[in-house]
Amino acid sequence: MSTSTQNIPWYRHLNRAQWRAFSAAWLGYLLDGFDFVLIALVLTEVQSEFGLTTVQAASLISAAFISRWFGGLLLGAMGDRYGRRLAMVSSIILFSVGTLACGFAPGYTTMFIARLVIGMGMAGEYGSSATYVIESWPKHLRNKASGFLISGFSVGAVVAAQVYSLVVPVWGWRALFFIGILPIIFALWLRKNIPEAEDWKEKHAGKAPVRTMVDILYRGEHRIINMLMTFAAAAALWFCFAGNLQNAAIVAGLGLLCAVIFISFMVQSSGKRWPTGVMLMLVVLFAFLYSWPIQALLPTYLKTELAYDPHTVANVLFFSGFGAAVGCCVGGFLGDWLGTRKAYVCSLLASQILIIPVFAIGGTNVWVLGLLLFFQQMLGQGIAGILPKLIGGYFDTDQRAAGLGFTYNVGALGGALAPILGALIAQRLDLGTALASLSFSLTFVVILLIGLDMPSRVQRWLRPEALRTHDAIDDKPFSGAVPLGSGKGAFVKTKS
């Protein structure tokens, strides 16, 4: 940018169409967060009415994780072939239909299937909305686009909690799911009133349709085997998270089977760039493993170890959720200022200073605990707002929506594993110590993976002929594309 351009406030670099595109996607992501957390809010009511066991009730939450990876792949491929806008609208309709179906569910099986649909729609919304906004904004503002967008999910969760307190006591739990009709109306408005993403339009103008991830996996020469592996992965995930398996060896074996299948899909769809894709799945996996123990078990910690009443728990959780939402926006500014990877590492390092005090302070001062959680979540959880920008930069426009959707949602299985890890460690330690130690140690793994740019580094080690030296979204160089100690002159931009 020129000096005169740099002196202009960042928001004036955006025209009305770009703001409209962002606002629409942000509202879609808010609705996504709203719909996703509804089941957690009414789980006890659903369990009581349907006469479910604790395992069956918990499986209604896990169901969304079982289907997310396939939704990210399928709807991401739709976004790569037909445009980001159509994929985003389709995703909103899908998770809204699933939410509405939960309201009409006569029993466990119907609600479980509806939750599978919600998981697919949620995954598609993540990949399509993120690529839509990022590709619609100027290159030097794309970390802000990513961070601001992801903040919508946290806001949606806060809105859901407030709506729950107003609706359920008066009209019952089903009425909460009937609100799912509203996003469908919003999606129909989106279809007519928002433009297509600029990067996608430029890439596809006057060209033949691209060969998507779905084409490669399910229409290629290995389609039969891939279909069988898809069913095998779905069945394995169901047995792991909803099948009440007691044998740890069997669960580990099924988890290994899923890992092999997902890596196989990445190798087939990414060709020579498969090392980058596999490492990105690991980055996301560990990002969920360090953050979700706190996300999932913090309410339990506050109620059991600190003996807080429900009102106090709600206040503390507000600080935590609001901190994450603010952190997404702060992460956007940091990313555009320092660069995506450097901002990520600096924010996580700062969050490490706070994680021990959060669980060491005890419950004597609620406000101090709330403030510590606010800043810890702002720095540790909120920085994940720029994760779509980080992942998307490793994929070309033709494969970005499916690549981002599949990679992120496979790694998101860490969100289902994280509470289990926290609970297992808590059998030997108190819950606060378990959460602090797990988050503290695994955050360092993410710092190393991102700070050393391991996706590019492993690509250079294993398949250097397909190495990309620059970010496909903002053209910034990848530090892992050259050996450590090499100067800036070592970066020679490769054709994407």
Swiss-Prot record:
SUPFAM superfamilies: MFS general substrate transporter. Pfam families: MFS_1 (PF07690). InterPro entries: MFS (IPR011701), MFS_dom (IPR020846), MFS_trans_sf (IPR036259), SA_transporter (IPR004742). Keywords: Cell inner membrane, Cell membrane, Membrane, Sugar transport, Transmembrane, Transmembrane helix, Transport. It is found in: Cell inner membrane. It is a multi-pass membrane protein. GO terms for cellular component: plasma membrane. PROSITE patterns: MFS. GO terms for molecular function: carboxylic acid transmembrane transporter activity; sialic acid:proton symporter activity. The chain crosses the membrane at residues 22-42, 58-78, 86-106, 116-136, 148-168, 170-190, 224-244, 247-267, 278-298, 313-333, 353-373, 374-394, 406-426, 431-451. It catalyses: N-acetylneuraminate(in) + H(+)(in) = N-acetylneuraminate(out) + H(+)(out). Its main location: membrane. HAMAP family: MFS_NanT (MF_01238). Belongs to the major facilitator superfamily. Sialate:H(+) symporter (SHS) (TC 2.A.1.12) family. Catalyzes the proton-dependent transport of sialic acid. This is Sialic acid transporter NanT. It comes from Salmonella paratyphi A (strain AKU_12601). The lineage of its organism: Bacteria, Pseudomonadati, Pseudomonadota, Gammaproteobacteria, Enterobacterales.
